[in-house]
């Protein structure tokens, strides 16, 4: 989660929404990234999506069985859906997203039985640090 937070800080320095993600498989970091929607002018360039795309290219397969995704913010609907399609095993997030998060907030999708793949979800460390960084970013944007 520390590497994911480092990615979020990098996003912050580039005036992107400070969310970072890291994908690990067999105790090896396969990919890491941060939100790049603003710079890429791409609404799908969330940290999670960037990490999943990069990992799929590296292992030459979009199925990421056995992988764990660490992310500094609870995923949105798009990102959680991509995690299911990628067949990751574990999702560990730091801060809850009460506005757009769908894993435990709003839609609470982690408990839905209609998905063809079940992801083990847990809250990781650094929730406070991740939340503080996000709040600082949006406060600066408003001023």
List PLM regions with ranges:
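Zinc-dependent deaminase
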Residues: 1-12, 62, 75-143
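Short beta-strand scaffold segments in enzyme catalytic cores
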Residues: 19-27
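Small-residue (primarily alanine) positions within well-ordered alpha-helices
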Residues: 4, 8-11, 21, 31-33, ...
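Short beta->alpha transition motifs characteristic of CBS
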Residues: 30-37, 118
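Helix-adjacent hinge/juxtasegments
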Residues: 41, 45, 49-82
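Short, basic and Ser/Thr-rich N-terminal targeting/leader segments
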Residues: 15-19, 65
